[in-house]
Amino acid sequence: KLVAEQKQTEITNDIWDGESLLDESMFENGYADKHILLLRNKFFKSCAFRTKLQKWIKDKNITLADLKTRGFTLATDISQIVMVTTPNSLKYLKFVGGLSEKNICKWVENVTDTFGVVKWDKSTKFFHGDMVQSSYQLLNTLGLDKAQAEELLKPSFDYISLVRNDVEFMRYHFTDAYAREKDGEEKKAPDGLADRADVIFRLLFSCTHFNTTALYANFRDDVVSGLKSSLRRGHILLNGTNATLFGNGPELLKYIAGEKTTSELKKGQIYCKRFESGAKLLCARSPHITMGNPYCV
């Protein structure tokens, strides 16, 4: 018989769960403008953040002997240290009894120094990075009443109205959308609207009154229908950004330098250059899988 029981218990949390510090020298070729790389290897998974690791080591006069008292390394020279990772990034340890030098060495013997990069940071493409697209999963967990939902949707309705009634705004809308398709990071729309837009705008340029034709009216109606369909799927453009939270990065740098790991931020604070200091933010995990994910700071 399964019985639920309530009781008080102590839990522990890992402030550096699944993250690594990766020296900026590793961000080369196609990753020169990136700031995080999600890395994979055999039984290894970690989010590596761009860090001036070697500069920090030199500035703090950290020696190889110092590092060996605070962790484990096979490096023979301090200049070889380009990555600092965490035990829970090394999934192999779960299957062999936990963290030990013997277990780490066993893993090293069976892997190469080539890591797979499966993800990196990408900024939002909407309105030059000022807007981000929501999902129905997020909206369903906010508990909005009718009035709040109408307030949230009003900018989107106003946007659709401008697309419907302003030819120049329609041109702006599709210049932005077409640019997103060409960068290779967005799937091409199956309705072919971007390709049709290219033809439509050429005709508008050549014929002053083309926007009064049935051809333009049909195109405009298809665009408006597509925007409404996106809203029904929960794809609402909101003031926001895509960002990867770097948990306690300065504290990890302090730890490898042997310094006291005091917190750089107060409880309930995050730092993001996209927003003004003191702004109230709603953070949501992606993918958004539970109503417990939203975090207000």
Tell what function each PLM region has.
Residues K1-V297:
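Conserved small-residue
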